[in-house]
From Swiss-Prot:
Protein's UniProt keywords contain Transport: yes
UniProt lineage: Bacteria, Pseudomonadati, Pseudomonadota, Gammaproteobacteria, Alteromonadales
Protein task: Produces ATP from ADP in the presence of a proton gradient across the membrane. The catalytic sites are hosted primarily by the beta subunits.
Protein name: ATP synthase subunit beta
Protein family according to the UniProt entry: Belongs to the ATPase alpha/beta chains family.
Cellular location(s): Cell inner membrane
PROSITE patterns (alphabetical): ATPASE_ALPHA_BETA
Chain residues that bind ATP: 152-159
Gene Ontology CC annotations of this record: plasma membrane; proton-transporting ATP synthase complex
InterPro entries for this protein: AAA+_ATPase, ATP-synt_VA_C, ATP_synth_F1_bsu, ATPase_a/bsu_AS, ATPase_alpha/beta_chains, ATPase_F1/V1/A1_a/bsu_N, ATPase_F1/V1/A1_a/bsu_N_sf, ATPase_F1/V1/A1_a/bsu_nucl-bd
HAMAP family associated with the record: ATP_synth_beta_bact (MF_01347)
Species name: Shewanella denitrificans (strain OS217 / ATCC BAA-1090 / DSM 15013)
Gene3D superfamilies (UniProt xref): 2.40.10.170, Bovine Mitochondrial F1-atpase, Atp Synthase Beta Chain, Chain D, domain 3, P-loop containing nucleotide triphosphate hydrolases
E.C. numbers: 7.1.2.2
SUPFAM superfamilies the record matches: C-terminal domain of alpha and beta subunits of F1 ATP synthase, N-terminal domain of alpha and beta subunits of F1 ATP synthase, P-loop containing nucleoside triphosphate hydrolases
């Protein structure tokens, strides 16, 4: 173990000088050993500048750091605890417990920088994962072992949707979950912990948090720490769920680190290595012949612009994309999923079956027609439409409302109990709507209900 000294501190970037014959390797973890507030602070080597000097990024607050402090090279990258000891615990990027429940007591640690599984080891599955959320199960179904992105601007419900997915899948799935909070609000991390505790599934979830107030190095690596824990469960032959909130903050942390390291920015100020950094993370989130990782990632969309380099780079890696729309949210329809923009590789008659495919296609066709007619209705009114178009508009409005659904995790502020709708009931309901079975029921009856039977019951009560 070689020792060096701090020679320069610029915010989160720290330059450390080592003897010429003992220069640390890229990604090695260094530890500050000197006395003071910074004792034990971990630095990760990013660049070798020559002359024995390495440039590092601090994994914690650099307050109190000064030149001349002694630094020890640990000789390996950052490692985190893995295995069953991590379940029910909250850890930081270094795998240290932050829930005041004592030591983790792990039997094994893995380094967070690992290579993705080889082509031979990877496997793909077409088995569907039912979420109980109508719009998702119908239009953009998830695959077991697939990657899903929840795209949306600020305040359209990414985190609430993710919480509902965790609530529905983690409980029904009864497998293990890993939650990586990357640069999000501490309050949300706190809510999530108590949500899991109250519902009795905390002992099946490992949580890794690197929240908004953390330095960029911490936020850049916390997703890898969470993923490493998920990989261990997968390699043991289990099916594991990985939730990442928010993948955009991972990109943003990369941008901050890149600027601090003095790299020339590329489009819109992002780091020049954006695609590579995203690939390093996403290629590891995959299923192998031994087990599967099903991942759900929230993706913040800056200024609601899906062509922004960060969400655009993420799109390429996903099997299903759930796009949340501000327009739909403004109509009071939640979840605010855009059924015309959301896609899934699984929506194929050979995977989901002909009936499901036809119903999903029919719903999209009717909604697309309504979208096209909106301008005519705004200018000339409904009376100018043909009878066929009037029927299409009436059905589309009912479908729009029927795509809404009360969530379990939102019971506190909506006051209505959450609903889990099976795929069979979802298809039956939308098929009936498309075939005109419910043309006699007013559209208000379809708003915020679970199954179609509830809508019929609601309409009968109002009579």
């Amino acid at each position: 173990m070689s020792t060096g000294t701090v020679v320069q501190v610029i915010g989160a970037v720290v330059d450390v000088e080592f003897p010429q014959d003992a220069v640390p390797q890229i990604y090695d973890a260094l530890k500050i050993t000197g006395e003071g507030a910074c004792k034990g602070l971990v630095l990760e080597v990013q660049q070798q500048l020559g002359g024995g000097v390495v440039r590092t990024i601090a994994m914690g607050s650099s307050d109190g750091l000064r030149r001349g402090l002694e630094v020890v090279n640990t000789g390996s990258p950052i490692s985190v605890p893995v295995g069953v000891a991590t379940l029910g615990r909250i850890m930081n990027v270094l795998g240290e417990p932050i829930d005041e429940c004592g030591e983790i007591g792990e039997e094994e640690r893995y380094v967070i920088h690992r290579s993705a599984p080889s082509y031979e080891d990877q496997s793909s599955s077409t088995e569907l994962l039912e979420t109980g959320i109508k719009v998702i199960d119908l239009v953009c179904p998830f695959a077991k072992g697939g990657k899903v992105g929840l795209f949306g601007g600020a305040g359209v419900g990414k985190t609430v949707n993710m919480m509902e997915l965790i609530n529905n899948i983690a409980k029904a799935h009864s497998g293990l979950s890993v939650f990586a909070g990357v640069g999000e609000r501490t309050r949300e991390g706190n809510d999530f912990y108590y949500e899991m505790k109250d519902s009795g599934v905390l002992d099946k979830v490992a949580m890794v948090y690197g929240q908004m107030n953390e330095p960029p190095g911490n936020r850049l690596r916390v997703a890898l720490s969470g993923l490493t824990m998920a990989e261990k469960f997968r390699d043991e032959g289990r099916d594991v769920l990985l939730f990442v909130d928010n993948i955009y903050r991972y990109t943003l942390a990369g941008t901050e680190v890149s600027a601090l390291l003095g790299r020339m920015p590329s489009a819109v100020g992002y780091q020049p290595t954006l695609a590579e950094e995203m690939g390093v993370l996403q290629e590891r989130i995959t299923s192998t012949k031994s087990g599967s990782i099903t991942s759900v990632q929230a993706v913040y969309v800056p200024a609601d612009d899906l062509t922004d380099p960060s969400p655009a780079t993420t799109f390429a890696h996903l099997d299903a994309t759930v796009v949340l729309s501000r327009q739909i949210a403004s109509l009071g329809i939640y979840p605010a999923v855009d059924p015309l923009d959301s896609t899934s590789r699984q929506l194929d008659p050979q995977v989901v079956g002909q009936e499901h495919y036809d119903v999903a296609n029919g719903v999209q066709t009717v909604l697309q027609r309504y979208k096209e007619l909106k301008d005519i209705i705004a200018i000339l009114g409904m009376d100018e439409l043909s009878d066929e178009d009037k029927t299409a508009v009436a059905r589309a409005r009912k479908i729009e409302r029927f795509l809404s659904q009360p969530f379990h995790v939102a019971e506190v502020f909506t006051g209505s109990p959450g609903k889990y709708v099976s795929l069979k009931d979802t298809i039956r309901g939308f098929k009936g709507l498309l075939e005109g079975e419910f043309d006699h029921i007013p559209e208000q009856a379809f708003y915020m209900v679970g199954t179609i039977d509830e809508a019929v019951e609601k309409a009968n009560k109002k009579k």
